Amino acid sequence: LDQFKRGDYQGAIGGFSGFVKTYPKSLLAPSAQYWVGNAQYARRDYRAAIASQRQLIQAYPDSPKVSDALLNIASAQAELGDNATARRTLQELVDKFPQSEAAGKARQRLGSR
């Protein structure tokens, strides 16, 4: 996480990816995968960020990070100019995780467009 905070996003991607590969069953693996996607987003590699967040959702469907991953996917889709898909992703987030903090943010975004 220090690498991410310092702006060394490529280093953070390598570190977090390595952790997930080495310790895929760790309780910290979903968070590490989440940060891979965040670092890719910070590098403006939006397609890779979407893929990484989808990987989190697929590998760790019961993780509390899933709602945040969906919010990040929608953000990346919007950055790519795919606003219709971003809105669908935000709605999916609200439908699946209505009580989450991420759903609150999704509702705000849906209301502002």
What are these regions (language model features)?
Residues 1-25:
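Alpha-helical segment of the N-proximal tetratricopeptide repeat
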Residues 22-28, 59-65, 94-104:
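Short solvent-exposed coil/turn linkers within tandem alpha-helical repeat scaffolds
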